[in-house]
Amino acid sequence: MKKTSLAILMMAGMMGVSQVNAANVGYIDYGKVQDNYPLAQSAIKEIDSQTLALQQYMVDKEKQYKALDTPLKKQNFETTTTKEFQAKQEALVKLKAQKDELIYNKIQAAAKQVLVEQKLDAVVDYRVIFVGGVDISDLVIQKLKTMN
């Protein structure tokens, strides 16, 4: 009888400990947050604008190329244009990387604030959660809008 009572008490104690250690996990839909974040939208517009400008640059250069009359002029033009295009393309890639990093850092900072406010133990991407967790995407979006 004593052993049975002791076993029941131990199991009850273990159940209590396991419930105390249960983690509160939040998750965000990064795409949704990014789509509803004004800074991200303006960055996308800026990058799209730069991409269109680069495409227009190539169209203009193609017209200039067709107007050249000698093979030497064409070869020199190709060399110059290739260097200019690569420089512009690298600048665009660098701009996109900078904007992506800035947006990611701001979303992460907002998610950290929501984590603290909601007393969560972790925040993960929604694709990692199969069952359970708390969707904090809207809270992160609200936090981002008040941070700016």
Language-model-detected regions and their locations in the chain:
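Amphipathic, charged alpha-helical segments and their helix-to-coil junctions
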Residues: 23-148
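Positively charged n-region of N-terminal signal peptides that target proteins for export
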Residues: 1-4
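Sec/Tat signal peptide C-region and signal peptidase I cleavage site
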Residues: 16-22
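Bacterial N-terminal signal peptides
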Residues: 8-16
